[in-house]
């Protein structure tokens, strides 16, 4: 659910080179062409267009080896995984979900050069699980495209996500005529029940993670925390809520993510410093200056 922070670099965006590691598919688009590519992505992010992207399994909007990072969750590699998370996570209005489905957007900030665009987009979500509450969600993005107009890298931040979670809890508290604490407890129960139902349906045989539904529910409600706004990629219930949506697409891959171990995604394997300094991207986001000291570039 989790989605895009774009803090613009203070360097001048000159049409020179993309510093750091080179890429044979590096393109040189006009600003208008990059705007069109940006709009194409967001058009397909909305429901129900995102359903068609999910059904494609490997969205043609991504390169095969696309790299993606979302601040509140983790990094995502490859077109299939990114198709499941970027489009599949928000594609079912009838399934319990924190923010529901995206129904409209407005790009409020945009700057672009060569094959990179940095933008801020306010996406309106219909939180169908919270009485069709309409929520404006601010998503900051850096996106890089290859010569074929496919996304090869993206870096995303959900701005004010903690405020968003508090707003959802307040809405739930109002609906149950209770306190914020009671609403948080109710949300925990709802999410745990949904995760366990999904586990029982899809995580069978070698993919089974819990002995039974009771063991699943007890673990999710007592052994791990619900999670804070930055913990949708840590050992929390909120992280498992994110991955629960993906289980139906690939049980073998995603069942461990909702299980007790958390798989490779819902685990506390990073300190704050390690999160910030993680070397990940293959191509530098710095454009037009001979700077080779980008600490985010992978080895």
Swiss-Prot record:
Positions bearing carbohydrate: 28, 58, 77, 126, 177, 212, 282
EC number: 2.3.1.-
UniProt similarity note: Belongs to the bfoA family.
Keyword annotations: Acyltransferase, Glycoprotein, Signal, Transferase
Pathway annotation: Secondary metabolite biosynthesis; terpenoid biosynthesis
Signal peptide stretch: 1-20
MF term (GO), any: acyltransferase activity
GO biological process: terpenoid biosynthetic process
Protein name: Ophiobolin family sesterterpenoid biosynthesis cluster acetyltransferase
Known function: Acetyltransferase; part of the gene cluster that mediates the biosynthesis of an ophiobolin family sesterterpenoid.
């Amino acid at each position: 659910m989790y989605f895009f922070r774009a803090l613009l670099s203070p360097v001048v965006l000159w049409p020179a080179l993309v510093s750091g590691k080179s890429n044979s598919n590096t393109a040189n688009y006009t600003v208008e062409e990059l705007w069109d590519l940006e709009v194409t992505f967001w058009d397909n992010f909305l429901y129900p267009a995102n359903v068609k992207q999910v059904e494609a399994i490997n969205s043609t909007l991504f390169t095969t080896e696309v790299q993606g990072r979302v601040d509140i969750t983790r990094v995502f590699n490859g077109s299939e995984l990114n198709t499941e998370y970027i489009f599949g996570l928000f594609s079912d209005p009838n399934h319990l979900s924190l923010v529901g489905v995206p129904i409209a957007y407005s790009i409020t900030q945009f700057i672009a050069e060569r094959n990179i665009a940095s933008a801020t987009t306010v996406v309106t979500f219909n939180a169908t699980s919270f009485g069709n509450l309409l929520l404006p969600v601010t998503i900051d993005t850096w996106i890089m495209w290859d010569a074929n107009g496919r996304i090869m890298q993206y870096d995303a931040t959900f701005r004010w996500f903690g405020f968003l979670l508090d707003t959802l809890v307040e809405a739930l508290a109002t609906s149950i005529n209770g306190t914020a604490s009671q609403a948080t407890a109710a949300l925990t129960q709802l999410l745990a029940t949904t995760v366990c139902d999904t586990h029982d349906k899809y995580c069978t045989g070698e993919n089974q993670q819990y002995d039974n539904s009771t063991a699943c529910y007890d673990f999710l409600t007592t052994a791990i925390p619900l999670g804070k706004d930055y913990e949708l990629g840590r050992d929390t219930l909120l992280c498992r809520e994110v991955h629960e949506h993906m289980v139906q697409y690939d049980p073998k891959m995603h069942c461990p993510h909702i299980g007790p171990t958390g798989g490779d995604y819902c685990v506390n394997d990073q300190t704050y410093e390690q999160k910030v300094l993680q070397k990940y991207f293959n191509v530098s986001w710095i454009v037009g200056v001979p700077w080779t000291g980008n600490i985010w570039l992978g080895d």
